[in-house]
Amino acid sequence: MLPFKKADSPFKSNPVSRVGSSTRLNQLGNIKSNPTTPNAALYVTSSLNPSKNLPTNAANVKSRLQTQKDLDAFKQLPMVQKVNEYERLLNELSEAVSQFKNDELQEKIGQIITCNDVLKQQIEDLNKHRNYSYEVDKLSDRNKILEENSKFILKELVSYRNELKKLPKLPKSDKMVNRNVDVDDILKYAFKLAKFTKAPATVANMPFQIHPNNYVWPAEDSLRRGMLAQASLQAEEIIRHELGETDKENSNEVKTESKVDHDDDDDDEMEDVRISNENTNDEQRSKPPAASEHDTSKRKEEQNQQPVDLNLDLFDPDDEYSD
């Protein structure tokens, strides 16, 4: 590491010591020491040799370069390349000064200043990255602690589960759940739900869907309207059927037929009666019909009676098949 001059030079080659002047003065008191040679303990290694300059302690032992591949990757870093460029520019500047090349001095100094500014900015960024690395180390340590805690909790849960399995259990009931359901029960339940459900909006608005009015069979609304219209046209017959008056009318007709059979001998008298009945019918048609006392009393009784349940409630929620 001691620079020497060329052998063909007329001057003698003398080694240049890198030891400071104060150290050399202190070494003069020691007769055995040679002031022309530097002390091995005070020798300073080059800052551009990362494999030797990196300190090896417990904190950064993992960051020490171990292989040539790591060294090549280290040399490819932008900051290391800038440092090498800075060193090259300094060597060129020193060579230009030694050779008295004044035309290159200004250009070299400008390049050194720009390279120095870039290195300064990269050093500031390097400090930020170093702080980030410290935070990453802290987070990794915390992650390890949390992982250990989670493993411990899982182990405890597994042990508790095994203890619960060892505990005595209640006897199982012999009653089995009937999984086989009759189709009729499903249909009844579906009929009950159909009154309160409808097709979803996504299905109802699908294209090429057949509307219920275009079905071959009549829709539910048309069936309801038809039944209500038929009931409104035959209201009296339905009321009589519910009240049981049809049997009384049939019995009255049977009695009249028996009376007619007994009076076959009096044909002449019946003809006169028929003629008189026809005359009275003509008079009654010309006059407005007068309500008899029997009819009025009957109507009052019907009004006083409670309304009859005709079982025409098509929307009875208790009915199984009502739509």
Curated annotation (Swiss-Prot):
Coiled coil regions in record: 79-167
Residue stretches of biased makeup (Basic and acidic residues): 241-262, 282-303
Record-annotated disulphide pairs: none
GO biological process: regulation of transcription by RNA polymerase II
Keyword flag Nucleus: yes
GO molecular-function terms, A-Z: transcription coregulator activity
Role, per record: Component of the Mediator complex, a coactivator involved in the regulated transcription of nearly all RNA polymerase II-dependent genes. Mediator functions as a bridge to convey information from gene-specific regulatory proteins to the basal RNA polymerase II transcription machinery. Mediator is recruited to promoters by direct interactions with regulatory proteins and serves as a scaffold for the assembly of a functional preinitiation complex with RNA polymerase II and the general transcription factors.
Protein name in UniProt: Mediator of RNA polymerase II transcription subunit 4
